[in-house]
């Protein structure tokens, strides 16, 4: 799975807290769109905007932090 984010985003931090709590960071490729402009371009190509956090897996993309957190808990807890 890929997680598009940037460090100063409070919603991204909430997702990171869930990932840390579930001890599943090895399941992700983390893509900071402010550190690497190529990641921002990828995100725009995938979703037509730069809204983060954005979780991408084989089924598609998910953007709302609460939805991402619920998904992670339901699949990894």
Predicted regions and their residues:
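Short glycine-/acidic-enriched loop or helix-start segments at secondary-structure transitions
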Residues: 15, 40, 65-66
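Structural micro-motif
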Residues: 46-56, 65-66
């Amino acid at each position: 799975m890929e997680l598009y984010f940037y460090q100063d985003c409070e919603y991204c931090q909430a997702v990171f807290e869930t990932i840390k709590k579930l001890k599943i960071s090895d399941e992700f490729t983390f893509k900071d769109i402010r550190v690497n402009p190529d990641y921002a371009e990828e995100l725009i190509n995938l979703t037509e905007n730069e809204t983060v956090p954005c979780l991408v897996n084989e089924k598609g993309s998910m953007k709302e932090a609460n939805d991402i957190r619920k998904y992670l808990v339901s699949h990894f807890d």
